[in-house]
Amino acid sequence: MNESQISYDASNLSTNNKKNNNIRKKFKLSLYQLQKLALLGAGSSGEVYLVQDTQSKIKLAQKTVRYTEDEKTKNQLETEVKLSTLLKHENIIRIYATYFLKGKINFVMEYMDRGTLADLLKKIKKIPEKYVGLITYQVVKGMAYCQKEKRIIHRDLKPSNILVNSKGEIKIADFGVSTIVEGSWAQKKTMIGTYIYMAPERIDADIYYINCDVWSLGIIVMECILGFYPYIIYNNNELPNSVWIVHELIENNPVPQLDKNIYSQELIDFTNQCLIKDVKKRPTAAILMNHPFIQKYSNLSCDDLAIWLKTIN
């Protein structure tokens, strides 16, 4: 493949321009047609830009990662490239193209104009239960697809890897540290991911199961509801600064509980199910799809979330 030319599937790209309604499903896109509009974010390994295809006027996100000989980084990049061809679901961020140019790996993907769930939490601290339900329903759908159909463990599910757009759509992103399992478990070779969201078996066991992401989801839901990381109540209201402190907090304390006088029994039971310490008793995402808390919001549309998002600057 020529470095300046890529091919990707544009069949489900959205556009407000009526002239673009008949965009061909497959087309060639010159990299020189991608115009950078803004820097969306930057980290130690690269940047994310808002770009626009100058022909179709479609806005996309372009993640640029500096290529390195570091084995860990190479493995993550290779995993993300591989999974970009496997994952096609309405609640998984769609990567339309990957290419290598001037020492950098680039991912061209759909643009989520409301940023991440972490961005949302920074603005409003905590989210009303109804909207947590609408968000969680979509995340669980994406997780169930990954676990049941693709046998994929994300391994780094957290608010900054859950993306939001103004249409009320929620999508899981960043599968760089994910793994594919043949059965229901994987052998731990390295401790990878963000430790405050890690399931206890990810920290101290030689193997972990496909439902380890469910623990991460439980922590995320609690954080959205409470406005803070739930286990800080056992740590002098401070965020733990090491994986071993997280492990001690989980092992030596009961699972944090939501106030039954404030929150619904469905939500309380949902978080309790997600945060079962015994991995063999913790449900999978597919089982959670039938939980009353998820079913409660399954008939509502993304529009309900979109209307609420309009109230947040």
Report each predicted region and the residues it spans.
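Conserved N-lobe beta3->alphaC-helix segment of eukaryotic protein kinase catalytic domains
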Residues: 59, 64-87
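AlphaC helix of the protein kinase catalytic domain
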Residues: 118-127
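Conserved short submotifs of the Hanks-type protein kinase catalytic core
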Residues: 103-116
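Conserved N-lobe ATP-binding subsite of Hanks-type protein kinase domains
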Residues: 47
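Activation-segment/catalytic-loop signature of the eukaryotic protein kinase fold
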Residues: 98
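Activation segment signature within eukaryotic-like protein kinase domains
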Residues: 135-136
